[in-house]
Amino acid sequence: MNWRSEHIWVELLKGSRKRSNFFWACILFLGSLGFLLVGTSSYLGKNIISILPSQEILFFPQGVVMSFYGIAGLFISSYLWCTILWNVGSGYDRFDRKEGIVCIFRWGFPGIKRRVFLRFLMRDIQSIRIQVKEGLYPRRILYMEIRGQGIIPLTRTDDKFFTPREIEQKAAELAYFLRVPIEVF
């Protein structure tokens, strides 16, 4: 979602609360729970859930391995659910031409650096960069080059949904708004 006026451009970023993350967190949780229940059932020697027959599975080595995969999957699933809950990666980019200030804000993982807030002057922006990598896993990333701070990504590095036309359009609009050149690399 974008909000734009003559002097201010605000772009909100979605973060980790994407449909695909919800899908994979659910699938991983249910699958690993199934593995753990089958491993536990093989240890106890009786079916905990009638849908998952486990009397033919010996506890050693199959039940141990399934329990291990179940526990590992639950840890990974809990990590995904935590990133969704904390909405890691969400935030906004705010460009204010009137005051000449750019603010970039992102939510991170809990701790000292949970809030990532970058603030700098517009006159320090050297260019808008587009990185294009084609092939099996195409990548199109929009960066902002800042004097003294290097390059800062403006789009998610795992976002593959931008077509070349969309990324060019976005870069052109932003470069026009900021009055800086565009570089492609």
UniProtKB/Swiss-Prot annotation:
It is a multi-pass membrane protein. Pfam families: Ycf4 (PF02392). InterPro entries: PSI_Ycf4_assembly. The chain crosses the membrane at residues 21-43, 63-85. GO terms for biological process: photosynthesis. The keyword Cell inner membrane does not apply. One of its GO terms (cellular component) is photosystem I. Keywords: Chloroplast, Membrane, Photosynthesis, Plastid, Thylakoid, Transmembrane, Transmembrane helix. It comes from the Eukaryota. It is found in: Plastid, Chloroplast thylakoid membrane. The keyword Cell wall biogenesis/degradation does not apply. Belongs to the Ycf4 family. Seems to be required for the assembly of the photosystem I complex. This is Photosystem I assembly protein Ycf4. It comes from Hordeum vulgare (Barley). The lineage of its organism: Eukaryota, Viridiplantae, Streptophyta, Embryophyta, Tracheophyta. The gene is ycf4.
